[in-house]
């Protein structure tokens, strides 16, 4: 059977972005938005457990990275690719080799179905909750157990197995979420952003 598609956001899912940018925003009054600092995205630390999780999930999923970058920071686009190559490799042994999508509207990629793991509902992430496309948005950390260092990997591995016997990927997510009493995502319209976002 064909492997299901898994799309992973970078910021606050693979990369520990927000904690670093919030710290910079509190220290520096000269910067309106810390995400516009050239080079800022190149050296951010990975989220705990993220690198190992991607490698493990690549055995069950076709994995893609789906992220956005600030329009006012052209280096961010290149820096994100450099970050991914640093942690996952630059050749065809990488689980994400030539599977990187950078777009301001993440909904453009959902029509082929799949799961998007993203921490925030905006930039088209919540549009992935679409039964017609058999796509679903799983909000990273909305349920504190659904993080890399907790139960997210086992949740996604279970979804992959259940998907083999259900009609849709969305149904598989629903079955696994119900079985473990997982909260898949929060409110799609109300979300507390950092003060500088």
Q: What positions do the PLM features span?
A:
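Active-site neighborhood of HAD-like aspartate-dependent phosphohydrolases
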Residues: 1-44, 144
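Non-catalytic pre-domain segments flanking phosphatase-related domains
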Residues: 1-8, 171-197
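Conserved Lys-Pro-Asp/Glu-containing loop-to-beta segment of HAD-superfamily phosphomonoesterases
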Residues: 5, 95-128
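Short catalytic/ligand-binding loop motif for oxyanion handling, primarily in non-cytosolic enzymes
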Residues: 15-18, 65, 72-76, 108-111, ...
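Substrate-recognition element of Asp-dependent hydrolases with the DxDx(T/V) motif
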Residues: 45, 50-78, 84
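Hydrophobic/aromatic residues located in beta-strands of well-ordered beta-sheets
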Residues: 63, 100, 135-137
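A short, structured active-site edge motif that brings together acidic residues
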Residues: 67-71, 77, 81, 85-110
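Acidic, Mg2+-coordinating phosphoryl-transfer loop and its flanking beta/alpha structural elements
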Residues: 115-161
